[in-house]
C-alpha cells in the first residue's frame, strides 16, 4: 500500500491469509473476526483504531468490523459488492465522524495503477488463480462466487 505506515490484514480464511503472507501484503495478519478483530486493531494502533479501512468482503459482519476498527475521523472505503444494503447504526456510530467512500475502480487512478504494474512495483499475478474462455464465463463466475478450488480471481482469456 503506497504511503501506508502500517497495514493490518484481516481474513478468517486461512488459505487467503496464507496467500497474503506469502506475498507480503501487510505487516500484521489477523484471522480473528468481529469484536475480537476490532479490539486487535486497536491494540496494534495504541488504542486509536485504523486511520483507513478497506472493506472488501461485502457482509454485514465485515461492514460492522470496518467502521468499528476505524479511528474517530477515519476513512472507511467500501469496495465490496453487497447483496443487500448495510445498515448504518447511527446511534452507535455517533461521535466517530467517519468518512465513507464507496465504489469500484476510479478511472482517474487507472493510469497510475497501470504504470505501477508496468514498472513491476505493483504485483497482482498471484491473485489470478483461474482462467477460462468467454464461453465458460458462467462456470467461471460460479467458481469465483463460491471460492471453489481456492479461487481468488477468475480471468477471461481469448478463445
Q: Each predicted region: which residue ranges?
A:
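C-terminal hydrophobic helical "lid"/dimerization subdomain
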Residues: 64-68, 107-159
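Adenosine-nucleotide cofactor-binding segment
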Residues: 1-63
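Short glycine-centered segments of the SAM/dcSAM-binding site in methyltransferase folds
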Residues: 74-75, 99
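Alpha-helical segments flanking ligand/cofactor-binding loops in enzyme cores
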Residues: 18, 64-68, 91
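Rossmann-fold NAD(P)-binding glycine/threonine-rich loop
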Residues: 79-97, 108-115
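Helix-to-beta-strand junctions that scaffold the AdoMet/dcAdoMet cofactor pocket
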Residues: 70-72
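Conserved beta-strand scaffold positions in the cores of enzyme catalytic domains, especially
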Residues: 28-29, 100, 127, 131
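Conserved acidic E/D residue at the C-terminus of a beta-strand in Rossmann-like folds
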Residues: 11, 80, 104
Amino acid at each position: 500500500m503506497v504511503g501506508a505506515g502500517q497495514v493490518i490484514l484481516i481474513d478468517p480464511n486461512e488459505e487467503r491469509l496464507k496467500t497474503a503472507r506469502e506475498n507480503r501484503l501487510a505487516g500484521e495478519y489477523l484471522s480473528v473476526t468481529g469484536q475480537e478483530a476490532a479490539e486487535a486493531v486497536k491494540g496494534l494502533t495504541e488504542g486509536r483504531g485504523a486511520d483507513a479501512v478497506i472493506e472488501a468482503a461485502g457482509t454485514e459482519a465485515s461492514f460492522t468490523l470496518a467502521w468499528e476498527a476505524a479511528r474517530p475521523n477515519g476513512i472507511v472505503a467500501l469496495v465490496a459488492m453487497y447483496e443487500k444494503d448495510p445498515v448504518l447504526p447511527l446511534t452507535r456510530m455517533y461521535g466517530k465522524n467517519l468518512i465513507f467512500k464507496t465504489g469500484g475502480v476510479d478511472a482517474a487512478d487507472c493510469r497510475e495503477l497501470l504504470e505501477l504494474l508496468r514498472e513491476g512495483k505493483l504485483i497482482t499475478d498471484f491473485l489470478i488463480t483461474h482462467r477460462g474462455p468467454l464461453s465458460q464465463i458462467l462456470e467461471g463466475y460460479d467458481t469465483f462466487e463460491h471460492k471453489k478450488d481456492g479461487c481468488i480471481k477468475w480471468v477471461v482469456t481469448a478463445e
